[in-house]
Amino acid sequence: MKKLQIILITGCLFIIASCNSKKDAGGMSATAKKNLEAMHGITKCFDSKDFSKLGDFIAEDGIDHAGEQGDIKGLANMKAEFTKMVAAYDDSKTEVIKELADDEYVMTWQRYSGTMKIEQMGMKPGDKFNMSAIEVSKFKDGKAVEHWTFMEPAEMMKMMGTPPPPPMEDKMGPAKDSTSK
């Protein structure tokens, strides 16, 4: 009986010891933390409207799939496009709602607000905007190599002054359990 207790206690101690994570606090690897810091750096470039350090966070041959006219290829083209973009608005602010990172991707749910300086996307100078988006960036060697933006269509339409379509009519009615009688 004592032998069995010793085996059980040893087994429990082994399980407890094996559950002890060797990762840094926060559960992220060093690579994931580096990727998240790079994403924070990119966000700071937009908030400050200063893209001189963008090359510290984005690869030379990076691709932004969220350009107004389609893919933006290369760091130099991104800097030019981003500079043009931020010139269209004032008092912009980015709020991070939630962020997730691993060794390959960083995903951030962000809220953007500001005031338009020029007429663009159906908005006039002085119009306020407030929108949210999911930003997804793929990283390699600590730099973003690809980026996508996902936005709620109804929120975009509202921001652009276009009313969203009415909700779809429920033609199916409530769901029924076909297995019960």
What residue spans do the PLM features occupy?
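Short, low-complexity N-terminal intrinsically disordered segments enriched in polar/charged residues
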Residues: 19-56, 60, 163-179
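Bacterial N-terminal signal peptides
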Residues: 7-16
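A solvent-exposed, acidic/Ser-Thr-rich amphipathic alpha-helical stretch
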Residues: 51-103
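Hydrophobic pocket/interface hotspot
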Residues: 39-42, 53-55, 62, 74, ...
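Exposed beta-sheet edge and beta->alpha loop/turn motif
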Residues: 111-141
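A mature extracytoplasmic/lumenal domain signature
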Residues: 100, 111-114, 151
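Positively charged n-region of N-terminal signal peptides that target proteins for export
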Residues: 1-5
